Amino acid sequence: MAMPVKLTPASLSLKAVCCRFSSGGHALRFGSSLPCWRRTPTQRSTSSSTTRPAAEVSSGKSKQHDQEASEATIRQQLQLVDVLENMGISRHFAAEIKCILDRTYRSWLQRHEEIMLDTMTCAMAFRILRLNGYNVSSDELYHVVEASGLHNSLGGYLNDTRTLLELHKASTVSISEDESILDSIGSRSRTLLREQLESGGALRKPSLFKEVEHALDGPFYTTLDRLHHRWNIENFNIIEQHMLETPYLSNQHTSRDILALSIRDFSSSQFTYQQELQHLESWVKECRLDQLQFARQKLAYFYLSAAGTMFSPELSDARTLWAKNGVLTTIVDDFFDVAGSKEELENLVMLVEMWDEHHKVEFYSEQVEIIFSSIYDSVNQLGEKASLVQDRSITKHLVEIWLDLLKSMMTEVEWRLSKYVPTEKEYMINASLTFGLGPIVLPALYFVGPKISESIVKDPEYDELFKLMSTCGRLLNDVQTFEREYNEGKLNSVSLLVLHGGSMSISDAKRKLQKPIDTCRRDLLSLVLREESVVPRPCKELFWKMCKVCYFFYSTTDGFSSQVERAKEVDAVINEPLKLQGSHTLVSDV
């Protein structure tokens, strides 16, 4: 197994290529001190940038330089950025990518004909700029489609598969219900692409067929980043073929460098992930959590969700606590649902309320002792580490997060015992907490870089991010787990809609819930990308990452409850060596 990745001669060569593109096509000596290269040691990747109004985009080169004939077109520059992001190595080229995107954004604001007269370039620019925090409107995409005479139909693109593919990808980054143009483009492009898959007419190239098939598997928010990276690395022959058809990306050394760095980065990450997972497995045994026979053992799934989204090596602490608290919340959930008596549950809540004074209260059972001791030790260790990182005491906040979860679960138990049927509003207020994302996501915010003051934690934006993420996740879960929970005598949003909706059927209730699910997802992404923000962008991104995790497990089935549904994805991210397709057959040779 490879050791942690370092910049190699190949990746340095690739940096030179990126720098050439970011400078407008003029070759630059690697390491030259141009304005677009300057950044502080703490400056983050463009994936963590905030939404930028026009005035805040870096000036880069002079206007005269920007207007010079450029060897690389905007489309070619964006294609390079897209390749680096899809291969999971964009963070190594943050400054170069920022230059490219700043230049592209200026061209977007100026309605440059290279963007506005080319549908494929416009769609790609819209998608990449938006997801990197630039303030772009879908109205521009509407005008481009309308100007092409295809306002009511995308049929004119029937034989232009790549344009259809870019339109389809652009349609998935909606941040508002008002962006109906994206829904329309998405529906039509998806239909035409599926027709092409079925007929094979316009997809004569097997690589293009596979690329379309992969894109239609689901929107970008339904998979984990590291799984997406793996697919692109293993199917690099598809990307390489497209690069070879593109001037200034067709250099075989460039494609080889991209592949080499991507493989080293992914493989070294697996080495790290395996070590972290082994540590977590030991922790489960040390805490005696494996002795709780009633509890679902979901460590692998929680670690997959952490490594699959927070994949950078420096986020080890965040991954570890994410997985630990995921395991603990699942055990607590099972304890409240099926295993604990009312006396045991009340005892556990009281112990957490007492916290450091818990010795004044006896453990009602060994099960309570194991669960409380695991929470207590983990929270105190985490609090000590977080307090050092944040330069202030954090433990009290971590205890409050757990107490909020336990009290909301106790409310659910009391409803069940008294046979009380809550209103839909009552249910959602409580159920967004009982879904259990608080102890997983909120502590991780302290370990992704920025300082999180107490005023940030108390700000309404912080609460809104949590509410949108938790509501989206809870509704996705309810739709997929309705049958099982109904058989167990439990209420959820589906059954409440049926109960309060008169003659509404179960299938109608599930369809009706799709709108609030979509709304929460769009509103969350909008808030994450918003520039005017109290919560730092790297922290906001964790809420979005967990939203993607919820889609990953619950968008089509109850993938979390199954022991095997996502087992192959666990291996794909953590254990399984890369298997390259096409001409790149031996990873070790790259």
From Swiss-Prot:
Sequence motif: DDXXD motif, positions: 333-337
Transit peptide location on this chain: 1-53
Induction profile: By herbivory, wounding or elicitor treatments in young leaves of cv. B73, but not of cv. Delprim. Induced transiently by F.graminearum and combination of jasmonic acid (JA) and ethephon (EP), an ethylene precursor.
Chain residues that bind substrate: 333, 337, 474, 477
Gene Ontology molecular function, alphabetical: (3R)-(E)-nerolidol synthase activity; ent-kaurene synthase activity; hydrolase activity; magnesium ion binding; R-linalool synthase activity; terpene synthase activity
Keywords, comma-separated and alphabetical: Chloroplast, Cytoplasm, Hydrolase, Lyase, Magnesium, Manganese, Metal-binding, Plant defense, Plastid, Transit peptide
Cofactor(s) the protein requires to work: Mg(2+); Mn(2+)
InterPro entries in UniProt: Isoprenoid_synthase_dom_sf, Terpene_cyclase_plant_C1, Terpene_synth_N, Terpene_synth_N_sf, Terpene_synthase-like, Terpene_synthase_metal-bd, Terpenoid_cyclase/PrenylTrfase
Region listing for Disordered, in residue ranges: 39-71
Cofactor note: Binds 3 Mg(2+) or Mn(2+) ions per subunit.
Primary subcellular site in the record, as a coarse category: cytoplasm
Entry GO terms, CC: chloroplast
Pathway: Secondary metabolite biosynthesis; terpenoid biosynthesis; Plant hormone biosynthesis; gibberellin biosynthesis
Entry's Gene Ontology BP terms: defense response to fungus; diterpenoid biosynthetic process; ent-kaurene biosynthetic process; farnesol biosynthetic process; geraniol biosynthetic process; gibberellin biosynthetic process; response to ethylene; response to jasmonic acid
Residue sites binding Mg(2+) 1 per the record: 333, 337
Tissue: Expressed in leaves and sheath tissues. Not detected in roots.
Biophysicochemical property: temperature dependence: Optimum temperature is between 30 and 37 degrees Celsius.
Family, as annotated: Belongs to the terpene synthase family.
Job of this protein: Involved in the formation of (E)-beta-farnesene and (3E)-4,8-dimethyl-1,3,7-nonatriene, key signal molecules in induced plant defense mediated by the attraction of enemies of herbivores. In the presence of geranyl diphosphate, catalyzes the formation of the acyclic monoterpens (3R)-linalool and geraniol. However, the in vitro rate of sesquiterpene formation is about four times higher than the rate of monoterpene formation. Mediates the conversion of ent-copalyl diphosphate into ent-kaurene, thus having probably a role in gibberellin biosynthesis.
This protein's name: Acyclic sesquiterpene synthase
Record gene name: TPS1
